[in-house]
Amino acid sequence: MARLVGVDLPREKRLEIALTYIFGVGRTRALETLAATGISPDKRARDLTDEELVQLRNHIEANYKVEGDLRREVAADIRRKVEIGCYAGIRHRRGLPVRGQRTRTNARSRKGPKRTVAGKKKPGRK
């Protein structure tokens, strides 16, 4: 199994798709990397030679921030926003959407499952 920057690439997938399993590499970066190294995007990950793996590894490490480094940077950015108390930091702290999405309805993935609140009691008949 081919390993790049600590990630096992799926053997049966085309390289264009397999490279997107690396955090920080999407379709565009995958295609840029393959073009720069001269490897066909249609090639399967299982067919990579050791030389091609080294080329891919060197190109990705030299040009992009990926995996652990990128995760640490994103976490540090969020932590900084929370510490300075800016609007985005407050939204992160409260677990609400940060980028202006509506919250009256929806936003369930950010807010978590609904928590039922007791309603107002109706007075009984006599």
Swiss-Prot record:
Keyword set includes Ribosomal protein: yes
Pfam families: Ribosomal_S13
Region described as Disordered: 95-126
InterPro entries, per the entry: Rbsml_uS13_C, Ribosomal_uS13, Ribosomal_uS13-like_H2TH, Ribosomal_uS13_bac-type, Ribosomal_uS13_CS
One GO-annotated biological process of the protein: translation
Annotated SUPFAM superfamilies: S13-like H2TH domain
Keywords: Ribonucleoprotein, Ribosomal protein, RNA-binding, rRNA-binding, tRNA-binding
Keyword RNA-binding: yes
Recorded GO CC terms: cytosol; small ribosomal subunit
Intrachain S-S bonds: none
Entry GO MF terms: rRNA binding; structural constituent of ribosome; tRNA binding
Entry similarity comment: Belongs to the universal ribosomal protein uS13 family.
Function (record text): Located at the top of the head of the 30S subunit, it contacts several helices of the 16S rRNA. In the 70S ribosome it contacts the 23S rRNA (bridge B1a) and protein L5 of the 50S subunit (bridge B1b), connecting the 2 subunits; these bridges are implicated in subunit movement. Contacts the tRNAs in the A and P-sites.
UniProt subunit comment: Part of the 30S ribosomal subunit. Forms a loose heterodimer with protein S19. Forms two bridges to the 50S subunit in the 70S ribosome.
Protein name according to UniProt: Small ribosomal subunit protein uS13
